[in-house]
């Protein structure tokens, strides 16, 4: 848990030094079950976004280094699972075509107020 807390502190300091386009969010998914017991396991879910893949990859590497530093300070280990890909843009042409065809077939009727 202490490593997870130190990781969170590190991410807060990291946020002060990223571009305004970056978005970094995290939550403690697992952090123990009793207030007076130090858990043997803690888990943090972090989401990093930015304008392009290169920036996200750089921020991800930085966050990993923060996690490794937190683990080093607490004599624990840090493990990483990458659950989502990092895409600049992942277009869905078939869905876009279907949506366009539907909008043409069933035009939206607007009122004067809208």
Feature-to-residue mapping (PLM):
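Midchain, well-structured core segments that form catalytic/ion-binding scaffolds
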Residues: 1-114
């Amino acid at each position: 848990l202490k490593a997870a807390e130190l990781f969170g502190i590190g991410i807060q300091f990291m946020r002060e030094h990223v571009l305004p386009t970056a978005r970094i969010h995290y939550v403690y998914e697992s952090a123990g079950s009793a207030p007076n017991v130090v858990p043997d396991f803690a888990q943090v879910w972090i989401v990093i976004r930015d304008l392009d893949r290169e920036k996200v990859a750089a921020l991800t590497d930085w966050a990993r280094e923060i996690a490794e530093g937190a683990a080093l300070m607490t004599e624990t280990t840090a493990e990483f699972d990458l659950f989502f890909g990092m895409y600049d843009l992942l277009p869905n042409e078939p869905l876009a075509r279907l949506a366009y065809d539907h909008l043409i077939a069933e035009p939206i009727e607007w009122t004067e107020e809208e």
